[in-house]
Amino acid sequence: MNYIVFDLELTCWEGDMAGRFQEIIEIGAYKIDPYGHIQSQFSKFVKPVMYPILSPFCTKLTSITQEMITQAKPFKQVIKEFMDWAEIDIEPHYLIAWGDKDLDYLKADCLLHKIDTEWISSYTDLKKQYQKVKKLYEPKGLKHATESEGLEFEGTLHRAIDDAYNLTRIFTKYFGEWNLHKIN
């Protein structure tokens, strides 16, 4: 069993994004073994196709530059590399993210690029799980949750690999307490 703790960054614009499809521009992930130990990491930029030019707002929010995504591979190649790295076809796995939006965006980009989404069948929203484990009235953001655990947020907020790392720190801290479940 592999636990794949991941985060995504997407194309974005200031204000109303109605009618604009947000594409994945960065995937960051950590592979955790059945004992709660980090095995490896995955970090790739993705070249968007619908809106290939990043907005100034997106660059400011994520620190991802136009040059970074222009030089990146397209989603279809990057997601194949991700699936190979995560051993999706070899090992049982759970995908784990902070909130349910990353799942929606991952599925949407797969559908856009005509990639089967069956491999996204086991997913856990750790934000909801954290709220239950900590008995919080309302969910917290990742940075707040990290700092609430007495941990300094490491890296740059809204960079997929850094957000995934901080999420991994929370996931491994409470490793035996999560109620992981399969979605369909």
Question: What function would you assign to each model-found segment?
Answer:
Residues 2-107, 120, 147-155:
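Conserved non-catalytic scaffold segment of RNase H-like nuclease domains
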Residues 6, 124, 162:
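Active-site flanking residues adjacent to catalytic metal/cofactor-binding acidic residues
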Residues 10-12, 128, 166:
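Short, glycine/acidic-enriched loop or turn micro-motifs at the edges of active sites
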Residues 94-100, 105-110, 140-184:
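Acidic, Mg2+-coordinating catalytic module of metal-dependent nucleases/exonucleases
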Residues 110-120:
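A short alpha->loop->secondary-structure connector
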Residues 124-138:
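Short alpha-helix plus adjacent loop in nuclease-associated cores
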